[in-house]
């Protein structure tokens, strides 16, 4: 994108008439711009002046009145880490980033179930997997680099399943530029689509797990060694009728049983989800249903297996791990007096021990 001609900002009244597309076409800001009280528009200032102005405003504000927000696209880990350290040095805990809005349900559920708020596998595990299930996720559009791994997994014979409210065209067939054969003829990415209601994820996945448990397809050894609460979950699923699950999911008993049988017979599987799962009032329930299936089948901690909360931007996971979050310190540690004291010993200045 070319640099913006700063003269167009001297009177910003004309900008109000432009569409968002027209505003983007103006280009990127090449210099700091300032609009002073009473002026019709913005004028260019130096970087030194911009930094001095921002510094003075921050210094004049009390810590509880400060707030810092970091976006994720293009932000490296070092930027996240340095920002959270600077904000906490100011005595504030008011730092946030775009990743929290996207995957908070994943963070909460993964931390409370498996102990780590991150994916348990990598793209290379797709290649070694028998089944790859995408739930509310469209990698062809949102993570196109990942499709080359998907292509190789398909070549090995993996079954690819999509659970979504919409049959995404890119998930039907995609042309992968880095693979000559695919670039010419395209690659069929998905073997089977399961369409569900908006908000029907948890019900559909509960039906899948209901079939697995009812037919004895669970991994009993893994469950005994690594999980708890199976019998309570089994009783809850048995008490839920197929009619209820059909009404809530928008799918059919046969389709839920079909996917349950596929996963029940698979030796390995990766469950992948994205915004289509988390951006709901029931986001945590949706993610928990995914974790329950993986736990019941032992699809965690082995090659070709895993839970993958796939991210949309290059720097998103860094925001979660580097502590650019009012409720988490670096490495994802909770904000409390004990963890704050450990960080204080390293940094040499007081760390706010509350996220409020």
Model regions: which residues?
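Cofactor-pocket helix-loop regions in the catalytic cores of large enzyme subunits
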Residues: 27-316, 321-322, 329, 334, ...
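Long, contiguous juxta-domain segments that are non-catalytic but functionally important
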Residues: 1-19
């Amino acid at each position: 994108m070319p640099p913006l001609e700063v003269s167009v900002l001297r009177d910003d009244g004309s900008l109000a008439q432009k569409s968002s597309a027209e505003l983007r076409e103006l280009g990127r800001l090449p210099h700091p711009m300032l609009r002073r009280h009473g002026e019709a528009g913005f004028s260019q200032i130096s970087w030194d002046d911009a930094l001095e102005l921002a510094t003075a405003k921050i210094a004049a504000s009390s810590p509880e009145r400060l707030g810092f927000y970091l976006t994720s696209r293009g932000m490296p880990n070092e930027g996240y880490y340095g920002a959270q350290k600077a904000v906490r040095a100011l005595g504030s805990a008011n730092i946030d980033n775009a990743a929290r809005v996207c995957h908070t349900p994943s963070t909460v559920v993964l931390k409370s179930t498996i102990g780590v708020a991150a994916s348990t596998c990598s793209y290379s595990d797709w290649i070694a997997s028998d089944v790859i299930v995408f739930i509310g996720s469209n990698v062809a559009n949102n993570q196109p680099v990942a499709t080359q791994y998907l292509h190789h997994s398909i070549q090995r014979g993996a079954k690819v399943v999509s659970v979504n409210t919409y049959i995404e065209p890119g998930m039907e067939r995609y042309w992968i530029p880095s693979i000559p054969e695919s670039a010419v003829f395209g690659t069929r990415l998905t073997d089977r689509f399961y369409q569900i209601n908006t908000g029907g994820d948890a019900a559909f996945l509960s039906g899948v797990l209901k079939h697995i448990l009812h037919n004895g397809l669970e991994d009993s050894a893994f469950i005994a060694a690594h999980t708890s609460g199976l019998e309570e979950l089994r009783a809850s699923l048995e008490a839920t009728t197929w009619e209820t699950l059909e009404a809530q999911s928008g799918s059919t008993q046969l389709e839920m049983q079909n996917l349950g049988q596929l996963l029940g017979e698979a030796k390995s599987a990766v469950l992948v989800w994205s915004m289509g799962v988390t951006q709901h009032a029931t986001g945590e329930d949706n993610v928990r249903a995914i974790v329950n299936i993986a736990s019941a089948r032992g699809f965690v901690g082995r090659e070709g297996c895993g839970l993958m909360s796939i991210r949309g931007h290059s720097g998103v996971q860094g925001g979660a791990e580097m502590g650019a979050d009012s409720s988490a310190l670096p490495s994802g540690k909770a904000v409390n007096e004990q963890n704050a004291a450990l960080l204080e010993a390293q940094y040499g200045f007081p760390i706010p021990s509350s996220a409020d």
